[in-house]
Amino acid sequence: MTRAFDTPLETIGQVLAGPWRKPVNMLLTQSYDDHLSIHDDAMANKLGFKAGPIEGPTHFSQFAPLGEAIWGERFLAEGCLSAHYRNMVLEGEDVRAFIEREPGEDHARIWATKRDGTEVLKGTASIGPHAPPSALDLRLNE
């Protein structure tokens, strides 16, 4: 099978791990209608944060090679990620994405951590219309 990504992946038991990445804050200077985003350092500082956090879709992109390695192109066409962000990541911090699924299942557990073990996000990945409730579904029903 030809893979869409040449990302080096590591298998640890039933867990598939991506490489350590240093995401870049692509929204650092984002503004709309003269409103600064939380991703802007100045606004983040006003709110008491050290710097603007990396945006969520950047973290989601770390899961594309993992989902594609498990489910192939089907994940790219009809895959779903659902996650609860637990801690912010600032530019320059290392982040690693993980996915764990039972063989043959159409859903999996996902999470990402910083190098020091801090949880960045946790949730679910799935393909197709018959996957069990996503992380968001479960959270909304708490």
Where are these predicted regions, by residue range?
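Extended, compositionally biased flexible segments
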Residues: 44-93, 100-106, 111-120
